[in-house]
Amino acid sequence: MDNREKSRLLWKCRRGMLELDLLLQKFIANEIDRLTENQLKAFDNLLTHNDPSLYAWLMGHEEPEKELLEIVSFIRNCD
């Protein structure tokens, strides 16, 4: 992944909720180079959803749509 694409994803991690900002920015900073192409696409897709949905999925309050389940689980389990 080139630097421009990394920067674009980092920018998309900036949300309207501080909790999401912290969680997503930490995840992408630590994991971006280890994600597969499919995981990167899923992560990019995940970031198109609204903040309340993202928060509910990442906190485990709700289950995301099937195509996002793997990346959401991956984010939940990253430290």
From Swiss-Prot:
UniProt keyword annotation of Cytoplasm present: yes
Localization: Cytoplasm
Protein name per UniProt: FAD assembly factor SdhE
Family (UniProt): Belongs to the SdhE FAD assembly factor family.
Principal localisation: cytoplasm
Record's function text: An FAD assembly protein, which accelerates covalent attachment of the cofactor into other proteins. Plays an essential role in the assembly of succinate dehydrogenase (SDH, respiratory complex II), an enzyme complex that is a component of both the tricarboxylic acid cycle and the electron transport chain, and which couples the oxidation of succinate to fumarate with the reduction of ubiquinone (coenzyme Q) to ubiquinol. Required for flavinylation (covalent attachment of FAD) of the flavoprotein subunit SdhA of SDH and other flavinylated proteins as well.
Keyword terms of this UniProt record: Chaperone, Cytoplasm
Any single Gene Ontology cellular-component annotation: cytoplasm
GO BP terms, alphabetized: succinate metabolic process
The species this protein was found in: Legionella pneumophila (strain Paris)
InterPro entries per record: SDH, SDH_sf, SdhE_FAD_assembly_factor
